[in-house]
Amino acid sequence: MLRKLQKYWKKSIIFQRFTWMIGIVFIYMLGRQIPIPTVGVDKVVVGNASDSQLLENFGAITGIQFSNMTLFSLGIGPTMTMMILWRFLITFKLIGSWTSNKVNRLQFLLTLAIALLQSFGITNDSKFLLIFGYSHSTLRIITIILLTTGTFILNWLCKINSERGIGGMTVVILVNMILTFQSNIIRYFSVQQFKFSSLIQYGLVFFVALSILIWFNILLYKGEYRIPIQRVGLNTPYHASSYLPIRVTPAGAMPFMYGMTLMMLPPYIFVVLLHIFPGNQILEYLSVHIGLSQLPGVICYIFLLYFLSIGFAYYNYDPYEISKNMRNNGDYISGKKPGEETIKYIQYVVNSFAQFGAFTVIIFGGLPMLAVLLQGQGKNSVSIALLISNAYIIVSLLLGVIEQVDTMNSWKKYKNLI
């Protein structure tokens, strides 16, 4: 049996990568259970239990933990925040033709700075165990170092998964989302204390609603607008079917993922600023009302989702770069002159679908939370409202992983020439 598995493991690339992925997920789950020795295992990291649960639901993308302090409490939040800042630097041409070593060095320093900032914020309200005669400040510094180290260990695991496994960083995000999705459902039904008959009814309604949501997400993910293109000097039976695909939702699930990550950053910044300017009423007001359990925070989140949807749409489909590549390859759009006219036409198409994608993202992510707050419901209801956007993210990421596996198996579709 073991020999058969060993032979199959050597022959199957998918099985090899799947094994690596499972191993890395196991290490990640193990790291989530390793406590930081300077903080009690039963201590809530920030505020009260309900606040920490809400923050964890919002930080499900990055895997951040507020209910207890573990090696991977920061998750991949610093890395994702760095990636957002890096994309802004590239978009605004603030980074030239740098060498790979210089790029890696700057990305490392940015990640380190963000990890230290988040570690400082997450340890602000922590209750440390006064052990070995160390002072409170010393224990906090040790905790910050351990949390930052855990972040870079997790980044290393994600890099290994990208090289040898399946999904790269996406797998870590998927694990976090599924765990949070499951815990939210269990917590909601346990708090409501439904009767058995009511539980079955609500369960069926939830299942039907979730099925419709998944179906609609798949429809949006696979939907695309095809711009017919002509290829100069190409005369084959397939040249007439050449096209430029533009997805119906050009930004995909990235506005949700990076929007949640960015919304986790202001609380840390306000913690640092309140240490520098204690008693500042403006900072105190912002630190309290910028959260998603408050109306100003939800409104900021909706605007952030909109701008991220437009930004990522143009990042994924840059009209200038697309037009430039088409001209270099001898391709053109029928009825459109290469150059400025082609750029304007592609920009018009991308902008149309970017606006539609932004509208869809706001409906899935912003409106449910806004409705819950306007009805005056509690923080648990906000967590339930986040389930809609979480389901959207999970489906999108799973479809991306499935596409990667299909690409690996694409060689099986071709017959041997010899």
Curated annotation (Swiss-Prot):
GO terms for cellular component: plasma membrane. Pfam families: SecY (PF00344). Gene3D superfamilies: SecY subunit domain. The lineage of its organism: Bacteria, Bacillati, Bacillota, Bacilli, Lactobacillales. HAMAP family: SecY2. Belongs to the SecY/SEC61-alpha family. SecY2 subfamily. Disruption phenotype: No effect on general protein secretion. Decreases the extent of glycosylation of serine-rich fimbrial adhesin Fap1, but the protein is still found on the cell surface. The partially glycosylated Fap1 is larger than the wild-type protein. Part of the accessory SecA2/SecY2 system specifically required for correct glycosylation and export of Fap1, a serine-rich fimbrial adhesin. Potentially the central subunit of a protein translocation channel. The chain crosses the membrane at residues 21-41, 72-92, 112-132, 141-161, 166-186, 199-219, 256-276, 295-315, 353-373, 382-402. GO terms for biological process: intracellular protein transmembrane transport; protein targeting. InterPro entries: SecY/SEC61-alpha, SecY2, SecY_dom_sf. It is a multi-pass membrane protein. It is found in: Cell membrane. Component of the Sec protein translocase complex. Heterotrimer consisting of SecY, SecE and SecG subunits. The heterotrimers can form oligomers, although 1 heterotrimer is thought to be able to translocate proteins (Potential). Part of the accessory SecA2/SecY2 protein translocation apparatus required to export cell wall proteins. This is Accessory Sec system protein translocase subunit SecY2. Keywords: Cell membrane, Membrane, Protein transport, Translocation, Transmembrane, Transmembrane helix, Transport.
